[in-house]
Every structure is written in C-alpha cells, then in structure tokens.
C-alpha cells in the first residue's frame, strides 16, 4: 500500500463542495487535506458505511454507533421511523451537483458515559448527478452533521465543528481518483492545529481502508458473532461503573490491576449476555472456572448473582478477599479452592509407587462436574486442551479462551499449523486451530468469538451445542489421537507435593 502522504490545502483553498442555500450566507465548507487514491466509488461507499457503523475505528474514546434511522432499511422493510422521536434533527442540506442517496442517523456511544454523553449524528451519502457514460468524473460525498448547535455542547470525542465532509472523485478512464476531507466550522471558527491533526487522521482512516480493499485485503477478524455488540458493551459499562474503581484500589497481586480488572469485566459481560441467550433470566445451572488464577472472574460473576466456583493448582493472595461460602448440591464450599486436576482419562495406575508419602487425595479433582454446569477455561494453559474433553465427559457447555500452548500431558509444545492455509501460521493461531479440532472431535459445535478485551489472546471458543452421534464418541481414542497423557500423572503428584510444602511454610 502506498504511504499516506496527504496534500495539506491552504486556508484559502477553493472549496471542494458547495452547499446550496436560499439565504445570503453560503455555508463555508473548508477543505483541509486531499490524497490521490486507486480505490473506486464502490469501495469508498463500503468503507464509509463501515466507518459510520464502527466509529471506534477512528476514536478509542468510542464504543460503537447505534443506528437509529436508515432510509435504505426503512424503504426495504416498508417502515416509517418518526424523526420527531430523535430530537432536533438537522435539515438535509443540498450540494451543487449532488443528489441524496441515503440518510442515516447514528448515536455515538462513548466508552465512559461518566465523562461524556452519547451524541446523535446525521450521516448523509450523496452521489453526483448526471451520466458518467462518456468517461466523466464520478463524485461521491459523505457528510457528518452532529445534532448540536454550539461548540459547548460538543462532546470530547468529536471535533468541535458543525460538520465533516468526505469527498471522493473518480475517473473511470484513468482508474484513479482522489479523496479529501473538509470541515464546516462554527461561526468565527479558526483552524487550530488540533482540529487539523484530527482531519488528517480521519482522512488517513478512509485512505487506509480504501487502499487495503483495492489491494485485495480481506478482513480476517469478525466480532460480535454470538452476542450483539451493544448488549455486551452496555453490560460491560454497567459492571465497570459498579466495580472497577474498588477492584483496582483494593488490588493485592503484583500484576497490573487495570489490565486484569477491565479484561475480566469484559469477559464477565460477555458471559452474562451469552448465558441470558442460553438460559433466559430465571434459571442458571452454575459454573466452574478451571484454572481460575486470581479468582477475579469468579468473584465478579458471583457478585452479579451467577453462582459458581473456581479452582487452581496454586492459591493467590486475592482469594482471601474474593472467596465466599457457596451453597452447592453437595453442601457448602469455598468459591475458590486449591485443587489439581486429574482427569478420568489419565490412569492412576502406579500412583502409589511414584507418590510415596505426602500425596493428599483431597487436593485432587477428577474433572467430573454436575451435568449442565457451565465450564469456564480462561487462559487456563495446561487445562485448555482438556476443556472440551471434560465438557464431553460431564455433558457441560463451556467457553475456552486459549493463551499458552500445552499438550494433554501438560507440557509446553507448538501445536501443528492449521490445515486451512488461509489462516495465520502463528503459534497462537495454531493453538486455537488445534483445540478447535479437539472440540469438534468431542462432538461439540465449535463457535468462535473474538472478544473485545485488552489482550491479544482474545479468541473464545464456545461449546453449547452437540453435533453428530455423541454416544459413539470414544474419549480414550480422542486423547490418544492428540498425543496421550504420558507424564501427566507425575506432574500432578509433583504439584500436590509442592502444595503440601507451601502449606507447611
């Protein structure tokens, strides 16, 4: 892709677009930057629609946009949305040489509603009038009009201008064109450096995505496939406002509190909305978090009324704060427990010979859970490949978020490259592909979601539906197919003994 090197236009440059008006004062749309491009009008419109629907691409202060009105959708569905319900909606401006093609109204949702409120904005898509059959220029225009009347009303995440215009010009005969950005300033508005930088940034996003499409780029990562984005983000915002500050201020681990708190709040929000789809709001079978680490996710979910517990081979300082007494069908227990997993497929033969003394059976969990218990495996490392296997044994739905690559023996290893050559060949991509295949072999429909969490290890694999003849699945055969368990028992014995030593000290 050619480097982004825009031409900065002079303050007195000739306007790229002219707004028609019946009054004396013509709105002055001032061009700021222009760049040559090789992406056509179809790509330009696709890119602009994507940016309209996903404003977070341009601003990290924004979560998303909720589309409140769309003439194309309304026409297709025969619907009439009363604009009177949307407050003060700007009149549709006319531009010389252009006809209105589509009108959308979006609500910009900020990440922090404590800092700024959502803002409605009209987005207008225009096309040039007349025929281009003789090789004339094709012109397309996209206008953003915030629903505010003064600079003081403008939220922090939006440039303080009355309007933003993106203009695309294309020559079919030369198969090349240009794209530019213009501002409609408030009255008496100047051209401060900050607004100029923002204009360059906005144009760069259009150029980058447009040229990427023209060069054959295809998006690999798709979000919000299992649960709608707005539901997860609304729940996340509510959780953040309820818990984030207190959790960060009371952090006792040596790790970065902000990363862990916000990441687990995101995962909790996703799980809460996923569980709403699976179970409704009146029933929840409980959950178990295998390899629960600091126990924060278990703590948040319990606070929200979703009862469950977690275990890990090593206890954490934070457990003293997060662990609570939990009523279960088998009695009252701690919500966070120090246990080592010894799954049913791992033979216990010879345990007396290798354990000698100091092996405590009560520190071992066999990985069997009550039917229907939702299994959480969040960066569970050694337990990650076991997750779909344990789920199949106990008939439990699950979510698995892989991180570090381990085989079924618990040893570190590099998973084989994906068979699908279109997928990346990285260690993480290989791990995700490998555990996804285990999931499918265990009779689960492997649904995948790219979580919006502050981590590059953000792929979630959800197993909530069975497929094929589940009764014909032989877990032992599957375990052997993926490398077997040689050495796992010895690792468990060492972990249990180290746990004993920790308790003595």
From Swiss-Prot:
GO biological process: tRNA methylation; tRNA nucleoside ribose methylation
Keyword Ribonucleoprotein: no
GO molecular function annotation: tRNA (uridine) methyltransferase activity; tRNA(Ser) (uridine(44)-2'-O-)-methyltransferase activity
Keywords on record: Cytoplasm, Methyltransferase, S-adenosyl-L-methionine, Transferase, tRNA processing
Major localisation: cytoplasm
Top EC class of this enzyme: transferase
Coiled-coil ranges from the UniProt annotation: none
GO cellular component: cytoplasm
Compartments in which it is found: Cytoplasm
Top-level taxon: Eukaryota
Keyword Nucleus: no
Catalyzed reactions per annotation: uridine(44) in tRNA(Ser) + S-adenosyl-L-methionine = 2'-O-methyluridine(44) in tRNA(Ser) + S-adenosyl-L-homocysteine + H(+)
UniProt-listed Enzyme Commission number(s): 2.1.1.211
Function statement: Probable adenosyl-L-methionine (AdoMet)-dependent tRNA (uracil-O(2)-)-methyltransferase.
Family statement drawn from the similarity comment of this UniProt entry: Belongs to the TRM44 family.
Protein name (Swiss-Prot/TrEMBL): tRNA (uracil-O(2)-)-methyltransferase
Record organism: Neurospora crassa (strain ATCC 24698 / 74-OR23-1A / CBS 708.71 / DSM 1257 / FGSC 987)
Phylogenetic placement of the source organism: Eukaryota, Fungi, Dikarya, Ascomycota, Pezizomycotina
